[in-house]
Each structure stands twice: as structure tokens, then as C-alpha cells.
UniProtKB/Swiss-Prot annotation:
InterPro entries recorded: aa-tRNA-synth_I_cd-bd (IPR045462), aa-tRNA-synth_I_codon-bd_sub2 (IPR020751), aa_tRNA-synth_I_cd-bd_sf (IPR008925), GluQ/Sye (IPR049940)
Keywords: Aminoacyl-tRNA synthetase, ATP-binding, Cytoplasm, Ligase, Nucleotide-binding, Protein biosynthesis
Enzyme Commission code(s) on record: 6.1.1.17
GO biological process: glutamyl-tRNA aminoacylation
Record-given protein name: Glutamate--tRNA ligase
Disulfide bonds: none
Taxon lineage: Bacteria, Bacillati, Bacillota, Bacilli, Bacillales
GO molecular function, one term: tRNA binding
Gene3D superfamilies xref list: 1.10.10.350
Length: 120
């Protein structure tokens, strides 16, 4: 699944190592842009809603994760970049990357919840 996430970005298999670093790091190192995103006033409410839903989500798969993010959008009224960017930064430490629901699935529930909890 990990290789499939980055298939379009890779020319050869060895490129997977730097691309997939976020999956193996315990601590996120945020740059100024990422820090600005994660400091948004909507972030605690957003992370709290998402954390609660992902904690009990079954099955923990991309399609269900995508639906869950949509539910959080409806419940909080937070949408667009205000919704997706803080989730991406909290979960990956990056502003860009592969499809967010797929990334969340591959990271796994435990790692995702641990990362979200820092911003609740």
C-alpha cells in the first residue's frame, strides 16, 4: 500500500525511502508554513471531532476515513483548506502528499490518533 501511495511520484523504487519518511518518524518537525496552518483557531475543534470519530471507526480504511472527514466537515462547518490542511499537517507534518484518506489508512489508527492528540 505504501508504494502504491507514491507510485506517480517515483521514477525508480529507491525513491520510496525519502518520500515515505513520514510513515516511520515518531515526531513531526514542522516548518513555519506548517506551524501557521496548525495554529489556526479552528484546529482544536477540528482535531477533537476527527479524533473522536477515528478512534471508533470500523473498518479503518480509506473509503470510511473519507466519509468521516466529510462528516466532520458537516458537523463543524469547517471546509476546504481550513479542513484538509490542518489534518494533513497534524498527521504527516507536511503540506502536500498523497491522498489524505489513503495516507491515514496506511499510517494506521494508533499513529494517527497519537499525532492528532497533540492538537486537540
Amino acid at each position: 500500500k505504501l508504494v502504491a501511495l507514491y507510485q506517480k511520484e517515483m521514477s525508480y523504487a529507491g525513491e520510496i525511502v525519502p518520500l515515505s519518511e513520514l510513515f516511520f518518524r515518531d515526531e513531526q518537525i514542522l516548518g513555519d508554513d506548517e506551524q501557521e496552518v496548525i495554529n489556526g483557531e479552528q484546529v482544536p475543534e477540528l482535531m477533537n471531532h476527527l479524533y473522536g470519530k477515528l478512534e471508533v471507526l470500523e473498518p479503518f480504511e480509506a473509503a470510511e476515513i473519507k466519509k468521516t472527514i466529510k462528516e466532520v466537515q458537516k458537523e463543524t462547518g469547517i471546509k476546504g483548506k481550513q479542513l484538509f490542511m490542518p489534518i494533513r499537517v497534524a498527521v504527516t507534518g507536511q503540506m502536500h502528499g498523497p491522498e489524505l484518506p489513503n495516507t491515514i489508512e496506511v499510517l494506521g489508527r494508533e499513529k494517527v490518533l497519537s499525532r492528532l492528540k497533540k492538537y486537540v
